[in-house]
Regions:
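Hydrophobic/aromatic residues in alpha-helical transmembrane segments
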Residues: 16, 64, 113, 182-185
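Membrane-embedded translocation segments of transport machinery
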Residues: 118, 122-220
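Hydrophobic alpha-helical transmembrane segments of multi-pass membrane proteins
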Residues: 3-8, 48-59, 100-107, 120, ...
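Inter-helical loop and helix-membrane interface segments of multi-pass membrane transporters/permeases
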Residues: 23-48, 61-116, 143-167
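Extracellular loop-to-transmembrane helix junctions
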Residues: 1-17, 93-94
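Helical transmembrane-bundle signal
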Residues: 53, 60-70, 102, 128, ...
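Membrane-embedded alpha-helical segments of transport systems
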Residues: 4-12, 51-61, 205-217
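Membrane-interface alpha-helices at helix entry/exit sites of multi-pass transporters
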Residues: 1-2, 41-48, 81-82, 194-203
Length: 220
């Protein structure tokens, strides 16, 4: 169901957002205003994009802070217990690593999208994919991995109901980050020589591959 939602809903949504970004060539706050005709009020949706991105930033900066915290703990050799409850109950730890995340993000973005974010993510995403492949292979050799993979991949059609379908739809839109203007930003950097449909298919294929590998890592 999730894969069907990606194909039926995800591809059109991505192509739409890519096309808006490529046509407007500006930030999500102003892209609707730039493309609207006189008398139309589509520009108000730019403010929804801004508020949505602020909400996402409030969420992801905290999670990134947790990742940096665990990386520091790993370097210190403290691998016996994750201590998640103790970590999230400490305001000083959370605020400190949140600030570290914000400082790192501002430093990277100071070099603009192509000179900063694109250059960094090119190496980080490649390293993450290699790491996930290694962890997935390791998980397949764990005891009981066969039962875990059966639970992960064997469908149970008796569990399908309205809430499952809605959940699959929500996950499809969430995992593709559509509706907040983020994909429109990337669309503004897609040249006319590239097919928006092809770019959308590439994004969905890689996103699905990463999601599948994450499941292989977790369930066994």
């Amino acid at each position: 169901i999730y894969l069907l939602c990606l194909v039926i809903l995800g591809i059109p949504a991505l192509v739409l957002e890519f096309s808006i970004g490529r046509a407007a060539q500006t930030s999500p706050l102003f892209m609707y205003r730039k493309l609207e005709k006189p008398g139309q009020k589509w520009g108000i949706f730019g403010w929804f994009c801004l508020l949505g991105n602020i909400a996402l930033m409030a969420f992801y900066t905290v999670v990134c802070g947790w990742i940096i915290y665990y990386f520091v703990q790993f370097l210190r050799g403290k691998n016996g217990s994750l201590g998640f409850s103790a970590m999230i109950s400490s305001p000083s730890v959370n605020v400190f690593f949140l600030l570290v995340t914000v400082v790192i993000a501002f430093f990277i973005l100071s070099f603009n999208l192509q000179g900063g974010l694109e250059r960094v993510t090119k190496y980080m995403m490649s390293a993450l994919l290699v790491l996930m492949l290694a962890l997935a292979v390791h998980s397949l050799f764990l005891k009981g991995s066969g039962e875990g993979m059966t639970f992960y991949l064997k469908p149970d059609f008796s569990k399908i109901d309205g809430s499952v379908i809605v959940g699959a739809m929500n996950q499809a839109f969430f995992t593709l980050s559509t509706g907040m203007g983020g994909m429109a930003i990337f669309g503004s950097y897609i040249g006319k020589e590239h097919s928006l449909m092809g770019e959308a298919i590439h994004v969905i294929t890689l996103d699905t591959l990463v999601a599948f590998l994450a499941g292989v890592i977790i369930f066994p």
